[in-house]
Amino acid sequence: MSTILNKVLNFVGWETEDEEEDVETVEESEDVEEEESKKPQFIQPLSSRRTQNKVVNIHSASQFKVIVMQPESFNDAKDVCDHLKSKKPVVVNLGSVQKEVAQRIVDFLSGSVYALDGSIQKVSNDIFIVAPHNVDIMGDFKGDITGKAVFPWLK
């Protein structure tokens, strides 16, 4: 039971004297024992003990970036795919392009997402989230991009 207590105290930074150290030889007098117990003991600094532990800092990871793009032509779809290849999710706003161009962009992005094993999700009428395989898309969206109801230009 005392070993568990010693481990907890050592982890917190307080060290207890081992019982073996308390046992003194018969040759020493009691006065010497009292003087030794009053002397400060060297305790290993907490900072040096932490370097021995294998603890990973949670905040050491780099920041996660989400790219927001508003393509103006079909040629801008390549830039969206380049971000996907570098494992960055992209929010694509297709509100400024014609419906035929928007359809081509979504088709191109759908093929790219399939090839890269990612996902694509519709957020609103003209806004889509395109994510690589290392990003999960979660939330209450209006619908997946399956069917003619999602694409009004497919009437």
Swiss-Prot record:
Belongs to the SepF family. Keywords: Cell cycle, Cell division, Cytoplasm, Septation. PANTHER family: CELL DIVISION PROTEIN SEPF (PTHR35798:SF1). It is found in: Cytoplasm. One of its GO terms (biological process) is division septum assembly. Cell division protein that is part of the divisome complex and is recruited early to the Z-ring. Probably stimulates Z-ring formation, perhaps through the cross-linking of FtsZ protofilaments. Its function overlaps with FtsA. The keyword Cytoplasm applies. It comes from the Bacteria. GO terms for cellular component: cytoplasm. Homodimer. Interacts with FtsZ. The keyword Nucleotide-binding does not apply. Residues 16-44 are annotated as: Disordered. Gene3D superfamilies: SepF-like protein (3.30.110.150). Residues 16-35 have a biased composition (Acidic residues). This is Cell division protein SepF. Its main location: cytoplasm.
